[in-house]
Amino acid sequence: GGNSVGWFWKAGDTDGKTYTVKVHDFSGNNRYIFDDFQTQAVTLDLAEGGTYIFNMDDATNATHPFSIGTAANGTVYTSGITYFLDGVSKTYSQYTSGFAAATTRRLHITVPASAPQLYYWCSAHSGMGGAINTNSTLGSSNFAGSIQSTAKVNASAGFSIVTFTGTGSNATVGHGLGVTPQAFILKGRNFE
């Protein structure tokens, strides 16, 4: 074998993030988008133990109750999930029936250990969502750049670990720190 160098660190203890959810028309097909990232059916990465908030206050969501389940268009998943309309905790049935009339809409999920493959979808219309990876995830989906990345962030320490797949052309990658970093190290994972 050859010589190897490794860096090992932990960027944060518990993942968590708030995603702003909107519905976008892609050539006549409504799809969910996150944080204004203009790509449909993205696969979300949510770390086990992390708490994530999905904010559906935008008017484009009014008739599209955002749901999480174990199948692409159904089978509601409830472990670790709390639904809120206008700041009040609701059952899933109350959430979907009162969704359109609410001013503020939130879905909170604390991803349990060994959570199954999950999906996000609209409870009223099929084909609007995508997959959620939970097992062995090393961070949370980040839509701050021109390409999607996964970031493990400790903003108070000023440190993040970001993974992404390049496109072969110029792109920007979000780091999740909220301020411009002073330095960064980039290592290609497929180089010998």
What is each stretch, according to the model?
Residues 21, 60-63, 85-138:
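Extracellular/periplasmic metallocenter environments
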Residues 11-15, 25-29, 57-62, 70-75, ...:
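Acidic glycine-/aspartate-rich tracts in secreted/extracellular proteins
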Residues 47-49, 104, 167-171:
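Solvent-exposed, conformationally flexible loop/turn segments
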Residues 6-10, 45, 51-55, 108-110, ...:
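Residues within well-ordered beta-strands of beta-sheet-rich folds
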Residues 62-88:
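N-terminal V-set
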Residues 22-48:
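N-terminal edge beta-strand
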Residues 43-49, 114, 174-180:
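Extracellular/lumenal carbohydrate-interaction signature centered on repeated Trp-anchored short motifs
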Residues 1-16, 137-192:
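Surface-exposed molecular-recognition determinants
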